[in-house]
Amino acid sequence: MNRTKGDEEEYWNSSKFKAFTFDDEDDELSQLKESKRAVNSLRDFVDDDDDDDLERVSWSGEPVGSISWSIRETAGNSGSTHEGREQLKSRNSFSSYAQLPKPTSTYSLSSFFRGRTRPGSFQSLSDALSDTPAKSYAPELGRPKGEYRDYSNDWSPSDTVRRLRKGKVCSLERFRSLQDKLQLLEEAVSMHDGNVITAVLIFLKRTLSKEILFRELEVRQVALRHLIHFLKEIGDQKLLLDLFRFLDRTEELALSHYREHLNIQDPDKRKEFLKTCVGLPFSAEDSAHIQDHYTLLERQIIIEANDRHLESAGQTEIFRKHPRKASILNMPLVTTLFYSCFYHYTEAEGTFSSPVNLKKTFKIPDKQYVLTALAARAKLRAWNDVDALFTTKNWLGYTKKRAPIGFHRVVEILHKNNAPVQILQEYVNLVEDVDTKLNLATKFKCHDVVIDTYRDLKDRQQLLAYRSKVDKGSAEEEKIDALLSSSQIRWKN
């Protein structure tokens, strides 16, 4: 749709937007004419038939009448003309860029719309509109630059750290200088948030050389501890070793080097690697553990090769009845001892696979040795070996049963391995505490132990109560009846 020249002039005279011009001079006369045209354009929004209802404004700055009525009419009719104005805006795209009226003109209506009063004026337009709903006629200003910072990533180190702490996504690539990166790290440390510190350290690890990173972290112990923990978690042993070497932490360097054996699967290669760890500067306690680890793996390799040969030959009874379910290689010391007690219990002390040899070589405590050997021999139901395990002789040749782990634990392990009642009763009787003995005997149905204990306690009432728990007509019931009818026992109740 083509517009005539008159329509275009009417639009620019009536619109609150101004056409683009290259003339930057502040012409007082042109501003005055513009203001006059803007005021006269208000007449188009009201009924021209009634001249008495139209208030006029003189150009001397003094109000002739109330202009608020005209503005109300303008606000009421603005809705009907909104669609036409939108079409005009779409046709003139450059009109969306509003130019602020220059404040040099005393009578500029834009100054009235902003609520400003020039010196010497009697009444501002904002005062005249005080009884009407507020409506902004000023050109829309551009959004502040700060609202677009999410897109430009124009954040300071402190702002970036706060955003990271809140879980917001932001790039750290804009921090390119060493000073900015270190300030970013210091801000992260001051927040006391481990996740933020780790995120910044990952960025520094990727963008800084090792020498610069280690040098700066040496004087920042909090960040240094976080980096060490992070490297241990991700398994970056090479960088961790370089860091400890730079910090001259020999013991931690040795431990990190020792930890690398976990990545070696071949037993022979792992043994050779552990041999190189023996001479590293560990503490006295750690050095003993490293030596034991090397010796144990060396023994396991020998035992594994020998037992694999015996098992494949099929000439050894223990391997035929109980085939091996797993290899002994890289197993803990206690597991190796159990394996030795299970398959090599009767071997001479001089062999590597002998349980006694393992006990002496690795200084295994008596309690640990007895507990492991008992579990292994009870699983095989080798009750004679169990009995020999607790039988000791004094210097006079008398035998006595002694258990470093306590006979109550012996009873529980035997019951777990389905030991016969006669075996259980023998070891229940060896429990010294009476209450513990009665509880175990009742729990595992060792009736003879319960009956004999109540007899020794001369507790007739408890014996009568226990009589109802045994089977009718059983040997235990007959034994209880014989004790109750005996005149040689002086019952206490």
Curated annotation (Swiss-Prot):
It is found in: Cytoplasm; Cytoplasmic vesicle; Early endosome; Recycling endosome. InterPro entries: Spe-39, Vps16_C, Vps16_C_sf. The keyword Acetylation does not apply. It comes from the Eukaryota. One of its GO terms (molecular function) is protein-containing complex binding. The keyword Cytoplasm applies. It holds the Pfam family Vps16_C. GO terms for biological process: cell differentiation; collagen fibril organization; collagen metabolic process; endosome to lysosome transport; intracellular protein transport; intracellular transport; peptidyl-lysine hydroxylation; phagosome-lysosome fusion. GO terms for cellular component: cytoplasm; early endosome; endosome; Golgi apparatus; late endosome; recycling endosome; vesicle tethering complex. Residues 68-81, 90-99 have a biased composition (Polar residues). Residues 68-99, 123-152 are annotated as: Disordered. The modification Phosphoserine is found at S121, S124, S130. Keywords: Cytoplasm, Cytoplasmic vesicle, Differentiation, Disease variant, Endosome, Phosphoprotein, Protein transport, Spermatogenesis, Transcription, Transcription regulation, Transport. Residues 142-152 have a biased composition (Basic and acidic residues). Coiled coil: none annotated. The modification Phosphothreonine is found at T21, T117, T132. Proposed to be involved in endosomal maturation implicating in part VPS33B. In epithelial cells, the VPS33B:VIPAS39 complex may play a role in the apical RAB11A-dependent recycling pathway and in the maintenance of the apical-basolateral polarity. May play a role in lysosomal trafficking, probably via association with the core HOPS complex in a discrete population of endosomes; the functions seems to be independent of VPS33B. May play a role in vesicular trafficking during spermatogenesis. May be involved in direct or indirect transcriptional regulation of E-cadherin. Belongs to the SPE39 family. It is linked to Arthrogryposis, renal dysfunction and cholestasis syndrome 2: A multisystem disorder, characterized by neurogenic arthrogryposis multiplex congenita, renal tubular dysfunction and neonatal cholestasis with bile duct hypoplasia and low gamma glutamyl transpeptidase activity. Platelet dysfunction is common. Interacts with VPS33B. Associates with the homotypic fusion and vacuole protein sorting (HOPS) complex; impaired by VPS33B. A possible interaction with VPS33A is reported conflictingly. Interacts with RAB11A. This is Spermatogenesis-defective protein 39 homolog. It comes from Homo sapiens.
